[in-house]
C-alpha cells in the first residue's frame, strides 16, 4: 500500500517548509519555502558555515569601497537568503520562496525595492525570476507591494495570512500564491477557549483554509492556495486536495511512514455557491483586521517573530565576520 505522503502528492503539490538542504534532498519536493526563522536555524548549523562565509565574501565584493560593517551585514542578510535559495534550487525542480525583511511589512515602497534586489541577486547566479516566489507579509502595504511586483512579472507568496479578508484582497490583486496559516490559528483558539483538542474538520485553521480554497475555486481566482503552519497530521489530511501544502520535515517523515487510505477533502469542483463578490478597500481591510482579534494578534506576532529572527541572524553574521577577521590576522602573523 502506498504511503500517505505518496497519496497526498498525487492530489496536492507537496512543498518542503525548511531551509535544511539535507531534508530537501531526502524528500524531493517540487517546491520549497523558507522564512527568516528557517534561514536562521539553517545558518546556525555548522554544516553551512562555508555557505555563510561565501555570502559574506560575495557581499564584500558587491558593495562599493568604503562600506561600513552595518552595510555589510545588511547586504549579507539578503545574500544569505539567496545563497540558501540557490542551493535549494539545485535540488528541486520547481520554485523556492524567499522572504522580504519582515521589518518592511508596513512600507510598500521599501518592500518593492527589496524584492527587486532579491530577484537581481538570483539573476546574478543565472536563476530566472520564474523560479522564485517573493514572500511578503499580508499587510495592506505588503499586498499593494505584491500587486506592483506581479505586474513586473515578479511572482509573490503572501504569508502570515490568517483570515478571509486578507485572502480575498490578495486574489483581487492577482497575487500568484497565498499561504494561509493553519496551526497558528489553532494555537490562538486553544489559548482563548481552553479547549485542548480540535479534531479534524473542526480545527479552526482547517475551516479557514477550506473556506478560502472553496471561494477561490468558485470565483475562478488564479491565486494558488498553499496551506502552511501545521501542528499535527490531521490538519494536513483534512486539507488533502488543496493546491499546495508546505510541510515541515518532521511531518513529511511521519506521512512517509504512515500507511492507509487518504481521502481527498478539497476539490476544485466542490463549491460553496456564494454569490457575493467580496472586495475590500483599504478602510474595509483595516477595519476587518481590527475586528478580527485572532488575525490581528497573529499577524503582529508573526511579523515581530520574523523581525527578531532577522536581528538574530544579523548578530550571528557579526560574530562570524569577527571570527573571519581574527583568522586572517592569525594567518597573517
Curated annotation (Swiss-Prot):
Gene Ontology, cellular component aspect: cytoplasm
Functional summary from the UniProt entry: Transaldolase is important for the balance of metabolites in the pentose-phosphate pathway.
| Encoding gene per record | tal
Origin: domain of life: Bacteria
Record-listed E.C. numbers? 2.2.1.2
**Self-association or partners: how does it assemble?**
Homodimer.
GO MF terms held by the record: transaldolase activity
The family assignment reads: Belongs to the transaldolase family. Type 1 subfamily.
Q: Record's CDD domains?
A: Transaldolase_TalAB
Q: Sorted alphabetically, which keywords does the UniProt record give?
A: Cytoplasm, Pentose shunt, Schiff base, Transferase
Q: What class of enzyme is it?
A: transferase
Q: Which organism is it from?
A: Prochlorococcus marinus (strain MIT 9312)
Name of the molecule in the record: Transaldolase
Q: Which residues does the Swiss-Prot or TrEMBL record annotate as the active site?
A: 135 (schiff-base intermediate with substrate)
> Which pathway does it take part in?
Carbohydrate degradation; pentose phosphate pathway; D-glyceraldehyde 3-phosphate and beta-D-fructose 6-phosphate from D-ribose 5-phosphate and D-xylulose 5-phosphate (non-oxidative stage): step 2/3
The disulfide bonds in this chain are: none
Which cellular compartments is it found in? Cytoplasm
Catalyzed reaction equations = D-sedoheptulose 7-phosphate + D-glyceraldehyde 3-phosphate = D-erythrose 4-phosphate + beta-D-fructose 6-phosphate
What are its GO biological-process terms?
carbohydrate metabolic process; pentose-phosphate shunt
The record ties this protein, via PANTHER family, to:
TRANSALDOLASE
